[in-house]
Structure formats: C-alpha cells, structure tokens
C-alpha cells in the first residue's frame, strides 16, 4: 500500500464508534450511496430462499434504533449520564451526542434493551423514539 493509504487506515483505526458512524453518514451523503442497502438485500435473500413469508418477517422487528429526540434543559446532566451508561462513550463524546439531539444513541438493540433504555432516559427528562 502507499503511504497515503497507510495513513488513512491508521486514522480510521483510531476513530471511536460514534466518529465512525458519523463518517459513514458523511460518505453516504458525499457519494450518494447507502451502506445499509447492500445489507438489506443480503438479509432478504436467505428468507426468500427458505420459502418464508416476507410479510411475517417485516412485522416482527428484532433490532431497534434508540433515538434521543430532545430533553429538558434542566435534565441535561441526568440524560447525559444515562446516555453514557448505555453507550459506554466518554464524557465528551456523550455530551456531543446529547447536544446534537435528535440523534441515534444506540443501534441494533433488542426490543427489551431498547424499551429499557427509552424508559430510563424518559425517567430523567429525555424524549426518546424507537425505530
């Protein structure tokens, strides 16, 4: 590999999960592509090959996205603590995530985990939606 590609690879290795997610979104916007489109096609193929009914699979969602929509200004610190507990992010990263609301705080969560996180954040003054 060239020195330039080695440098880019080293930079990518040092990104946090939040930074990597933001990078993917920026790449999708800049190049007009979607990283999720390929995964959706691959995931649909096994169900179709097995002869399963696609409608049943679409009705029962197994992974959820937890989105912090907003929060009471007086509850910012409490919401920040809940986000840190749920994501394992550092203080600065969690603060940036909370202040950027509406923002996805957890992806690929089970229904139980997503609902528990929603309940915990709403209990301290945040508004959360599940997608």
From Swiss-Prot:
GO terms for biological process: translation. Keywords: Ribonucleoprotein, Ribosomal protein. It comes from the Bacteria. The keyword Ribosomal protein applies. InterPro entries: Ribosomal_bL12, Ribosomal_bL12_C, Ribosomal_bL12_C/ClpS-like, Ribosomal_bL12_oligo, Ribosomal_bL12_oligo_N_sf. Coiled coil: none annotated. Pfam families: Ribosomal_L12, Ribosomal_L12_N. Gene3D superfamilies: 3.30.1390.10, Single helix bin. The keyword Repeat does not apply. GO terms for cellular component: cytosolic large ribosomal subunit. GO terms for molecular function: mRNA binding; structural constituent of ribosome. Homodimer. Part of the ribosomal stalk of the 50S ribosomal subunit. Forms a multimeric L10(L12)X complex, where L10 forms an elongated spine to which 2 to 4 L12 dimers bind in a sequential fashion. Binds GTP-bound translation factors. Forms part of the ribosomal stalk which helps the ribosome interact with GTP-bound translation factors. Is thus essential for accurate translation. Belongs to the bacterial ribosomal protein bL12 family. This is Large ribosomal subunit protein bL12. The gene is rplL.
């Amino acid at each position: 590999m060239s020195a330039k590609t080695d440098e880019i690879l080293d930079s990518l290795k040092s990104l946090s999960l939040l930074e990597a997610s933001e990078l993917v979104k920026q790449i999708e916007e800049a190049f007009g592509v979607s990283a999720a489109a390929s995964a959706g096609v691959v995931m649909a193929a096994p169900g179709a090959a097995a002869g399963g009914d696609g409608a049943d699979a679409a009705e029962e969602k197994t992974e959820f996205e937890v989105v912090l929509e907003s929060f009471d200004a007086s509850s910012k610190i409490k919401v920040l603590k809940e986000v840190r507990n749920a994501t394992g992010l550092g203080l600065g990263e969690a603060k940036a995530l909370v202040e950027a609301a509406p923002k996805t705080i957890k992806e690929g969560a089970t229904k139980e985990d997503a609902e528990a996180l929603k309940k915990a954040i709403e209990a301290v003054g945040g508004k959360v939606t599940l997608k």
